[in-house]
A protein has these predicted regions:
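Thiamine diphosphate
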Residues: 1-121, 261-447, 452-453, 463, ...
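Residue(s) in the substrate-gating loop at a strand-loop-helix junction
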Residues: 126
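Short active-site segment of divalent metal-dependent hydrolases/proteases
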Residues: 129
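Short hydrophobic segments within beta-strands
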Residues: 47, 123, 152, 313, ...
Length: 603
């Protein structure tokens, strides 16, 4: 049943992680049915986090979460796309990989100081074992005899879209864990008897060392065409993330229901009875949508054709980074680094020192933060590296705050001689990459949104003029600066709302996140006294802060009224529309706040 409900939750949400949810669900089910009856004495959490639909499904089945939440995965005020401690039985926030064992160690220390006895079960992924923090966390757990910790490795052999062995082979992981002083047990993680035997074996160990149970599992277990064993070793696994098509959903549901009913018949129990829920139809727009990732992918190949020193790197995100065409075109110049961002960035540093031009790709949230020190170190060597951060900004909102990159501008702002750009449309993506490759002498950061977008105002630009922007909507009363298609589209729509109220809002696309041409800035604002900035980022540390620091030096700065819009709180999880509305970044709320600002009211 838990797999059936998990499948429904992901289909209804429109996105999620089926493969890892299905590989881990038997482990989670067994733990909750047999080991976790008393939360004060035993707890469980997932370090990898993206398997959380399976955990939600188990908790709902045991009536530990309200049943109606089954309809609210990745919805506002519902169940986040990655674990969040605001939800009952979520003991840590996860989604950013590698932190779970360290969190468990901290809990053990706190429990010991408070004379509290509690067993802690942690689930990690096998791809997650490529993160350096995992290995940093092991030795002291053994040295301090933290037998309270039992780690399950969901060893489903596939990370994201490809086999672990083809991405960054783990080698003999049993010997590796033993070398760090851990007890090591192996089991079939999709077989209850094997899981039970491994836990019984663990409980009978007399030493005080922590234990790792390497659970061999099948990614997508339970649905034949979703199981990773159905693909060849060179094929891409198709069910890591996203949602199944209608036909895939019907076929998968039928297979799961049939298997469950066969078991119930053997037990003499009635077959399953289901409540039908209408499928929410997808809102398909007839408007032309732009794809910045597709444009980036094409532009990178074009630049690589001209420059043999360009190499591309990514951290287990070849599909999301748009690099499959690059790998096919330049197989010898593509480097898959696995889930190891710090190592990837330092490798890029070595490549740059020896004359290559690395283009380093990952999600913006992971690329800007985890290897931040390595990026700075590379910059001190005065080499040239291009960093490309995808999944930037507050939407898509379904993944939750671990993946919503809303502090990357601030995180990278202190890097010397470092330019940051967020393009607005497809042509500007090409121009941005061309600028970074051919016109900027040091390192750079291109910030990209993955969402196909519809733009009310579009334009073509042959090249970028550093520090200068483009007016999308002309206006006389207020000037608004922003960047990227998501916030600028909302700003353009807000200008149309304000026009009906006789407020004229000029909307300017300024793709330069940490640089502005002062003379240009003066020229576009000289006739207004009200300035607004809109960041797809926290207000602190974003483009708005940078521009405010420039306006302070203007001779007539005391006459300028300045409003910074953006995020103040941890990003909400939900649909894109829900998330923008929750943070007052949608057109309607922007229009209200800008009108109040113009009229002298507090917002």
């Amino acid at each position: 049943m838990a797999r059936i409900n998990t499948l429904y939750m992901i289909k209804n949400a429109g996105s999620g992680h089926i493969g890892t949810s299905f590989s881990s669900i038997d482990i989670v089910s067994w733990l909750y049915l047999n080991e976790l009856q008393k939360p004060e004495s035993s707890i469980y959490f997932s370090s990898k986090g993206h398997d959380v639909p399976a955990l939600y499904s188990v908790l709902i089945s045991l009536e530990l979460l309200e049943f109606d939440l089954i309809h609210k995965l990745r919805k506002i005020d519902g169940l986040p796309g990655h674990p969040d401690i605001k939800i009952p039985f979520m003991h840590i926030n996860s989604g950013s990989l590698g932190m779970g064992i360290s969190k468990a160690k901290g809990m053990v220390i706190a429990n010991r100081l408070k004379d509290k006895k509690q067993n802690i079960f942690v689930l990690t992924g096998d791809g997650e074992l490529q993160e350096g923090q995992i290995w940093e966390s092991l030795q002291s757990a053994s040295n301090n005899e933290m037998s309270e910790i039992t780690v399950f490795v969901d060893h489903n052999k596939v990370q994201s879209d490809y086999q672990v062995s083809k991405t960054s082979d783990l080698g003999d992981i049993e010997s590796k864990f033993k070398a760090f002083g851990w007890n090591v047990i192996r089991c079939d993680g999709n077989d209850f008897i094997s899981i039970s035997d491994s836990l019984n074996q663990s409980s009978n160990i007399s030493n005080r060392l922590p234990t790792v149970i390497i659970a061999d599992t099948i990614k997508g277990k339970g649905v034949s065409f979703m199981e990773h064993t159905a693909i060849t070793d060179k094929s891409r696994y198709m069910y890591h993330s996203g949602a199944p098509t209608n036909q895939q959903y019907i076929e998968a549901s039928d297979e799961l229901i049939s298997a469950q009913n066969i078991l119930l018949n053997k037990l003499g129990e009635p077959e399953l009875n289901f409540q039908e829920v209408p499928l929410t139809p997808l809102q398909v727009s007839t408007d032309k949508k732009i794809s910045l990732m597709k444009s980036y992918s094409d532009a990178l190949i074009d630049q690589a054709d001209k420059n043999p020193n360009i190499v591309a790197m990514d951290a287990d995100l070849i599909l999301d980074s748009g690099l499959i065409p690059f790998k096919e075109s330049f197989p010898d110049r593509y480097f898959q680094c696995g889930i190891a961002e710090q190592d990837m960035v330092s490798q890029a540093g070595g490549m740059a020192l020896n004359g290559l031009l690395p283009v380093v790709n990952s999600f913006a949230c992971f690329l800007s933060d985890r290897p931040n020190e390595q990026i700075y170190n590379n910059a001190t060597e005065k080499t040239k590296i291009i960093y490309v951060g995808g999944l930037a900004g507050v939407i898509p909102g379904g993944t939750g705050h671990s993946h919503q990159s809303v502090r990357d501008i601030a995180a990278l702002n202190g890097i010397p001689d470092f330019i940051m750009i967020e393009p607005y449309n497809e042509v500007e993506v090409q121009a941005a990459l061309d600028f970074c490759v051919n016109n900027w002498e040091s390192s750079s950061y291109i910030r990209l949104t993955p969402l196909p977008c519809t733009l009310s105002v579009d334009y073509e630009v042959s090249d970028l003029h550093i520090g200068k922007g483009t007016t999308l909507v002309d206006g006389d009363d207020i000037v608004l600066f922003s960047y990227g298609p998501n916030t600028l589209e909302q700003a353009v729509q807000a200008s149309q709302i304000l026009k009906l109220k006789d407020i004229s809002l000029k909307v300017i696309n300024l793709p330069w996140l940490n640089f502005v041409d002062i003379n240009w800035l003066k020229s576009v604002t000289e006739k207004v006294s009200h300035i607004v900035t809109l960041d797809n980022h926290y207000r602190i540390g974003g483009q708005g802060d940078y521009l405010a620091s420039k306006f302070i030096n203007f001779k007539d700065s005391k006459k300028i009224q300045f409003l910074k819009l953006g995020l103040d709180n941890i990003p909400e999880c939900g649909t894109n529309e829900e998330v923008l509305r929750a943070h007052r970044m949608d057109a309607d709320n922007l229009a209200i706040d800008i009108e109040n600002f113009f009229n002298g009211s507090n917002i």
